[in-house]
Amino acid sequence: MAAGRHGGYRDYEARERELDAEASRRSKEQQHHHHPSGRHQRGDSDPRCEADRRRDGGRSRGGRELSNGYGHRRSPPPRSRLSARLGDREPGEVLSGSASDDSGGRPHRARENGVSSSSRDGESVVAASASSPSKKRKFSPIIWDRDSPKPMHSDVAKGKKAVDSVPTELPLPPPPPLPPQDHIPERLAVEKSPMDVEPAVASESPEQLQEHAESRVMEEEEEYSTMRNISTSRWAGANDDEEEGAPHRKKKSASPADSAELGQRKKALSPELGEVVASDISGGRTMSRSSDSGRLGADENEDLEVDKDDYMDVDRDDDGNSDIANHQSGMDSEYEVRRSETPEPVKPPHRCINMLQGCRSVDEFERLNKINEGTYGVVYRARDKKTGEIVALKKVKMEKEREGFPLTSLREINILLSFHHPSIVDVKEVVVGSSLDSIFMVMEYMEHDLKGVMEAMKQPYSQSEVKCLMLQLLEGVKYLHDNWVLHRDLKTSNLLLNNRGELKICDFGLSRQYGSPLKPYTQLVVTLWYRAPELLLGTKEYSTAIDMWSVGCIMAELLAKEPLFNGKTEFEQLDKIFRTLGTPNEKIWPGYAKLPGVKVNFVKQPYNRLRDKFPAASFSGRPILSEAGFDLLNNLLTYDPEKRLSADAALQHEWFREVPLPKSKDFMPTFPALNELDRRTKRYLKSPDPLEEQRLKELQGNIGNRGLFG
């Protein structure tokens, strides 16, 4: 079949000369044929059969050569030669299809070739073409239709115009391999034998034959378009029509002169009554196909010319010719309708890799003054040049980091950007400086921190003012714990105040998310004065109770205007706690004996002397606290973490509902804002910072995961 597929392309001229000589000889022999109907039957012993096969095979291959897009492009022969050859040709020879040398007994489609061609020749001999079974012509099998696209249907539609053609060799790229034989469309697998078709041909009138031919042309068109898309979409270029699912590579046109009939496309624009819209199975394009058998010659030629020029247009696209724009500007209706009906997939959005591309520059802010500098970074007061808003710029310290961006700052940015609560400081955005080493967090500006305010105050807060501040603190801590976040560094210097009486929790550098069951964490968290006893004793599994201990220490500091436990070391801190609250034991703190730091001998003090520091009534200037207030403070400073009060339970405590009631935020005392110099001169007593302790141990080479008693 390979020889039949491509071999006839190069010896066309020799075959045509031989066929012309045989055509005149056959015209004489036709008159002496013994069959009464005048229709020739192909015999195995007839010396003319081999010439018929060669001529029919050449013509079948020539038809495919005209349209398959794999080989050479052909031009239609002159009309004088066509008319002369039509007179010499038998009426039934057009229907012989592809004459291959390898088969003799398989049936061929009679309606596809015999009926349509004879109806267009208009000869009455075909109407009486019923023959005896003994001398019936044997048709060649449709081997070509299984392996390659259908012959160009323009030959069938034009009738006398394009029965035969002369090959024209053009320098084209070598043909790609054809699809495999086992990939056969379902439409082409159904064939009819001549025994089933020819009796109906003999009894029909020429008008009926014409209608049958028209319907066969439309069926051919459907089969051809489907086969064309299946066989050629596999070889389409990757850069052609990327937006469409499967690019289409069209077949070559018959002649450049066919483009002159583009103006006739308007008749085939809209489908008439009874037309069916068939979808190409490989390209996603819809093509309007007609099932009406009443449309004849001129309309067929117009439709076929549209398809032919459609193929030529895409060939120009594939070949990269420069006249694409001129051709497309002259196109009408059907090709554009087909293109417009194709839903183009939406392109995926362009994804950026630079994570800091959307960050603003720090130059868009005007620095006013330096507020504070601590372990975690430097804080500036600045003004947004666009909006005029006063904000706080916290610069992340990068010079001490050996492994990239600081983990503490990453956690803080991640948590604060995901939280929004009135009692938690709001981080608006992250801005960058001239390099990646200068990164700033833009936060809302708060005039004071609680520690600086208390140092500036001459008198401690009243109980109503303490209740107002404690309610805001507990609401913020409850929000954190409800979202599975441990702050792990609650202290008065991390509580910000403004002149509207609002309190906000800040500095989430040590905070982290936790889960259930608990996982071991480092105990080097929380500033020493506010660190829970279980952390001081070396436990690694802790939960929200460590934050509630810090809340209790803050409450006591608000009432007394000084820290409750101000030890300088872990041992001294535990000693101060035990002297005030009593030495714990297994009875009041289950699991206490298993803690790592219990091996050290502490002072044995069995009494809780917290009430002595916060009496109900005082004549010596000590801070007073009601029974309900003392109960709340005592439950917050419980040794056993399981019995320690939670934030939700603390908010429901009766102390907040007794007289004096919490003061409104609007009536809270205000203070002038302090700059960095004022803060440094006012702070005489500074609590040890856990990160400073850890950095000091790293410098000394004594990095440990255990506490003092490990």
Curated annotation (Swiss-Prot):
Binding residues annotated for ATP, in chain numbering: 371-379, 394
Gene: CDKG-2
Biased composition (Basic residues): 31-40
Listed Low complexity bias regions: 124-133
Compositional bias ranges of the Acidic residues kind: 299-308
Induction note: Down-regulated by cytokinin.
Positions bearing Phosphothreonine: 375, 522
Name the record gives this protein: Cyclin-dependent kinase G-2
Reaction(s) the record says it catalyses: L-seryl-[protein] + ATP = O-phospho-L-seryl-[protein] + ADP + H(+); L-threonyl-[protein] + ATP = O-phospho-L-threonyl-[protein] + ADP + H(+); [DNA-directed RNA polymerase] + ATP = phospho-[DNA-directed RNA polymerase] + ADP + H(+)
